[in-house]
Amino acid sequence: MENHGGPTSTAKGLLAIAEDVDSDWFGVNLDTGNFHSDDVYAELAAVAPHAINVQVKVVVSGPDKVKHPTDFARLAAILNAVNYRGYIVLEYEEAGDPRTESHAYLEKLRAAFA
């Protein structure tokens, strides 16, 4: 299940569902750009133990929808703290040329997880 609107738009709502599913085959596709609270990183940390895949967007935003660069080092610390061992996917949805911009962000992401 992905944190993508509706009842999954907050960590509390997503966890209410995720923790009710009693199956080793169920997990969260954690999208770093889909929480829009006052503390996006706290929400990511709350859900991280349930993550089986992580889609890293290059920006995060709060309730005001103002975009801020994703703090890759902070994200890496959150995922390392829960011993995350799944895939990490870079998802670039910004205005620049993805072929050019994605490479630079991928290098930053690799450095954060090194």
Regions found by a protein language model. Name each.
Residues 2-4:
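Short, well-ordered beta-to-alpha junction loops that form the rim of enzyme active sites
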Residues 7-114:
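Histidine-acidic metal/acid-base catalytic patches
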